[in-house]
Amino acid sequence: MAASSSGEKEKERMGGVSGMTGLGSTRERLLSALEDLEVLSRELIEMLAISRNQKLLQLEEENQVLELLIHRDGDFQELMKLALNQGKVHHEMQALEKEVEKRDSDIQQLQKQLKEAEQILATAVYQAKEKLKSIEKARKGAISSEEIIKYAHRISASNAVCAPLTWVPGDPRRPYPTDLEMRSGLLGQMNNPSTSGVNGHLPGDALAAGRLPDVLAPQYPWQSNDMSVNMLPPNHSTDFLLEPPGHNKENEDDVEVMSTDSSSSSSDSD
């Protein structure tokens, strides 16, 4: 009787537990079903052991415990199927999460490329607006084609793209000497022995005239007097260089009279 009463109490407890199993998650329900199966199996084994030792038949109680065990096993199998389905769904969710991460990475890459393209387009639009402003400004201050052609002809005629620092309107000089100017210069005459002025000497006619050749002509007005004086030939006589101080015509007459007297006295002595 004690065994039967304990079995009834166990059944009531198992019934209460089985009623509470529908409230939790699948994992909790599986654990609860396993605990119920463990308790029922232990109870059934104890009942079989007691009946064998006492040689008492308790078929009704054993059948009830066995039915509960079979019922809980069915619940456990259903929960296992549910868990397997949920496991498949979980794997699908993980695969979808990986796909979402991949798509998110692709979207971020595309977003980065779109930002770069936006920056490039913004720069291009800004430059285009600046060009349009320049075009509009050029249209407002347009220059006739004839003036442009004249200016281009003037540049091409001078064979130059940059004028000297001292260049003024009307100055025909170029920023560099031409081949003809180089040949007619001092260096060209030094390299050519057939011309006068070889070995660095100036032509005789230029020295005799007291002037400089065109190659050595001063470029500035303040240089003309100094360079003319410095470049005079050695045999060129000037009053301010060769005549001593106080020299005049009367001194010359006195010298001539003295020379005449000395010559006459020498003739008388003879």
Curated annotation (Swiss-Prot):
Residues 259-270 have a biased composition (Low complexity). InterPro entries: Mediator_Med4 (IPR019258). Its main location: nucleus. Keywords: Acetylation, Activator, Coiled coil, Nucleus, Phosphoprotein, Transcription, Transcription regulation. GO terms for cellular component: core mediator complex; mediator complex; nucleus. The keyword Coiled coil applies. GO terms for biological process: positive regulation of DNA-templated transcription; positive regulation of transcription initiation by RNA polymerase II; regulation of transcription by RNA polymerase II; transcription by RNA polymerase II. It is found in: Nucleus. Pfam families: Med4. This is Mediator of RNA polymerase II transcription subunit 4. It comes from Rattus norvegicus (Rat).
